[in-house]
Regions:
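Active-site and adjacent substrate-binding regions of carbohydrate-active enzymes
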Residues: 343, 404-466, 472-483, 535, ...
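Conserved structural scaffold segments of CAZyme catalytic domains across common CAZy folds
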Residues: 76, 83-86, 99, 118, ...
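Acidic-aromatic substrate-binding/catalytic surfaces of carbohydrate-active enzymes
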Residues: 9-98, 157, 250-253
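Active-site-adjacent "subsite" loops/lids of carbohydrate-active enzymes
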Residues: 334-337, 341-342, 349-420, 498-512, ...
């Protein structure tokens, strides 16, 4: 395969024999043809007049949202070398009455031996201007017959596509563990992904029309992406598209999985990460709520039934009610240290909950420590404020770049380990909640979005791991955003959506050999005997996740003996398969045929 650019009187084509893009010559940009995988036509002609939308911010407060029609289309330039060929499409934008224009350049590249097309964007700006938001690329492709959309929410979600439907991935978060979308039917899969090795916050979206589906990435930019000296804006990643006739799993394995090994979060094996052996050997977790005689009795009964080696994820141990007064957890409830000791004497492990993201503005510490100085700020200076049904109090989102917040979380990690003698600490929401643009001027990062969110959390957890985590202790977090995999010993995977979709094994297809996960989804909160508990743990087992994460007061009820026995049998089976579950590869989902009994699970 050899990449090349071909020009005719009517059009320009960039391709390599496997993929090609044809754009007609003329006064306006559009796509005549985009063929992927040796000839699979992907576009309806003349449906791609708007490949980008950019919002500018000028020095006087100008704030235009500009489309290609607001500029002058200048055609294209050609760039070729020994390994790739690119066509750079150019629009001149008039942003002032200076003689010069300010071009936007969209580069589409074909490389040797690749079945993908690569899309990049740059723009020139007047001095002091920035681009504050970007939609790029915007690519409308043919809607396939009986098409389905797969997003990377949690384990992965598959949706029946509906006209007018919008399918979104907010990355990195529980709704977007990876930065890709897959549209497929029985004939193959369209692949759309950003190759961002810095895990910048972004939204990938597919909007379904009657004949076409528009894929777009939308981002609140970082002002640091505009060079103050040159006035040049660079979108700091490449977007790729492809088509795989072997389906969505083949696309993920052939293109996305290799990309992850080029990222700092994807190139580390489990063996290289110094994970305590007791966690590698773990098969079962329970989730205790509270510090009472009833809870402790249920924990002991669980250990009696399942044996030693259970992990106990402890909640409601702190001084105030759950989801209130964060981060003022201490003093712990008086009986909690004894509870930890009892669990450990029975050769099990206990790891308590804290939140790594929220600061209650009514908490004593928010006033005493000037928590407002650490809060994440919107562009208008106000706070991101959230209310959870568990508490119905205000919680503000804290910027992870704040040095004050680092000091608080590190202090909590120290105190929990040194005073309560736990087996580590669980820090909620870090690998689950999406980044927020921050415009605070005192946090040491450029205003807006960008990579500061991920890199700030990485610096925080690296500091805990390198200087504060006691020997053989663990730190883990909620959900499975890919960039956080090597920061945490384990990820608690419970937030995959269920409504109007099917859960599919996209995440284990890509990452099963480089991550330890616990659970499959939230277990029942009132009754484990209705069928869903067994289904959840079956899926947990099949996806390679550590089992359970169940309330022991429910599991140890007399009426739940069938469920407890099922879970113990599954645990004993899993215990014999650690060579598969630790660094093993998830191959594919297999549904056995035959006359198998079926039950309806509510």
């Amino acid at each position: 395969i050899r990449d090349r650019v071909e020009e005719t009187a009517d059009a320009v084509k960039v391709g390599n024999g496997s993929v090609e893009l044809i754009v007609p010559k003329g006064k306006a940009f559009n796509i005549q043809s985009m063929k992927l995988n040796d000839g699979e036509e992907m576009v309806v002609p003349s449906t791609n007049a708007i490949p980008w939308v950019l919002t500018y911010k000028g020095i006087q407060g100008e704030n235009p949202m500009l489309f290609p029609e607001h500029g002058v289309y200048k055609g294209y330039d050609v760039i070729q070398n020994d390994t790739s060929a690119s066509v750079v499409f150019v629009w001149d934008m008039r942003l002032s009455y200076e003689k010069r224009m300010y071009p936007i350049r969209m580069k589409v590249t074909a490389t040797d031996h690749s079945e993908l097309l690569y899309w990049d964007l740059t723009a020139d700006l007047p001095k002091g201007w920035v681009i504050s938001k970007a939609q790029f690329p915007r690519i409308a492709v043919v809607r396939p017959k009986d098409g389905k959309m797969i997003t990377s929410a949690g384990w992965g979600n598959e949706f029946d596509m509906a006209t007018g439907g919008a399918y979104k991935v907010t990355y990195p978060s529980c709704t977007g563990s990876m930065q890709l979308l897959l549209m497929h039917n029985g004939e193959g899969s369209f692949y759309y992904a950003t190759e961002d090795r810095n895990a910048c916050g972004k939204e990938l979206r597919a909007v379904c029309g009657s004949k076409s589906v528009t894929f777009v990435t939308e981002v609140v930019t970082s002002e640091g992406w505009t060079d103050a000296t040159t006035g040049r804006f660079d979108l700091p990643w490449t977007t790729v598209v492809g088509y795989n006739p072997d389906g969505w799993q083949a696309a993920a394995l052939q293109w996305y999985r290799p990309f992850t090994f080029t990222c700092e979060w994807g190139n580390k094996s489990l063996q290289s990460r110094n994970i305590p052996q007791w966690l590698l050997d773990k098969d079962l977790w329970i989730r205790s709520k509270g510090v009472t005689d009833t809870v402790m009795a249920a924990i002991n009964k669980t250990i009696d039934f399942f044996g030693e080696g259970i992990g106990v994820h402890t909640y409601y141990w702190h001084n105030y009610p759950y989801d209130t007064h964060y981060p003022d957890y201490f003093p712990a409830k008086p009986e909690f240290e004894g509870m930890i000791s009892t669990i450990q004497k029975r050769k099990c492990h206990a790891v308590p909950y804290i939140n790594g993201r929220l600061w209650d503005p009514a908490a004593d510490s928010y006033t005493a420590l000037n928590g407002a100085s650490a809060s994440c700020r919107k562009a208008d200076g106000t706070l991101y404020t959230e209310i959870y049904p568990t508490s119905k109090v205000l919680n503000t989102v804290t910027c992870p770049a704040s040095s004050l917040w680092h000091k608080i979380i590190i202090g909590l990690a120290d105190k929990i380990q040194n005073e309560l003698h736990t087996n580590g600490v669980y820090i909620d929401q870090i690998a689950a909640a999406a980044p927020q643009p921050c415009f605070a001027k005192n946090h040491g990062h450029a205003a807006g979005g960008g990579d500061f969110w991920y890199k700030s959390y990485k610096a925080l957890i690296d500091s805990i791991r390198g200087n504060h985590l006691r020997k053989d202790n663990i730190v883990f977090s909620e959900e499975n955003s890919e960039c956080y995999i090597p920061l945490f010993d384990m990820l608690l995977t419970v937030n995959t959506p269920h409504a109007n979709c099917r859960i599919v094994p996209l995440f284990p297809t890509v990452y099963s050999d480089r991550v330890i996960t616990c659970a499959y989804t939230y277990t029942p909160t009132a009754d484990v005997t209705k069928g869903e508990f067994r289904y959840q743990n079956m899926q947990c087992f099949l996806y390679g996740s550590q089992l359970g994460w169940v309330d022991p007061t429910l599991l140890m009820r007399d009426e739940a003996k069938t469920e407890a026995t099922f879970l113990r049998t599954l645990m004993e089976l899993r215990k014999k398969q650690h060579d598969i579950f630790i660094e093993g590869r998830y191959i594919r989902e297999f549904v056995p045929g035959g006359d198998n009994p079926q039950i309806d699970v509510p």
